[in-house]
Swiss-Prot record:
Record-given protein name: Pyrimidine/purine nucleoside phosphorylase
EC number of the protein: 2.4.2.1, 2.4.2.2
Function: Catalyzes the phosphorolysis of diverse nucleosides, yielding D-ribose 1-phosphate and the respective free bases. Can use uridine, adenosine, guanosine, cytidine, thymidine, inosine and xanthosine as substrates. Also catalyzes the reverse reactions.
Catalytic function, reaction form: a purine D-ribonucleoside + phosphate = a purine nucleobase + alpha-D-ribose 1-phosphate; adenosine + phosphate = alpha-D-ribose 1-phosphate + adenine; cytidine + phosphate = cytosine + alpha-D-ribose 1-phosphate; guanosine + phosphate = alpha-D-ribose 1-phosphate + guanine
Organism whose genome encodes this protein: Shewanella pealeana (strain ATCC 700345 / ANG-SQ1)
PANTHER family according to UniProt: PYRIMIDINE/PURINE NUCLEOSIDE PHOSPHORYLASE (PTHR36540), PYRIMIDINE_PURINE NUCLEOSIDE PHOSPHORYLASE (PTHR36540:SF1)
Gene: ppnP
Amino acid sequence: MLAVNEYFEGQVKSISFAGADKPASVGVMEAGEYEFGTAAPEVMQVISGALTVLLPGQAEWQTFSAGEQFDVIGDAKFQVKVATQTAYLCIYG
């Protein structure tokens, strides 16, 4: 079943679905700065655009462009900067 989610006053929208192996969501972020929390480990894949990310325990920001991905540990917070509309796929667990 699909579930539509909206965060940060509509600046981030996603659709959750049951992926082939694990739960997932696909979404779009408007330009801005955001802080997300994780319950379980996540793999974030950038589909279009770019995400500049400060991962838990890291001191330096890293930029991931379309076709790239990064891992986020579970039970953590991470920060994201977005310069232009960016689409992503997030796989949980």
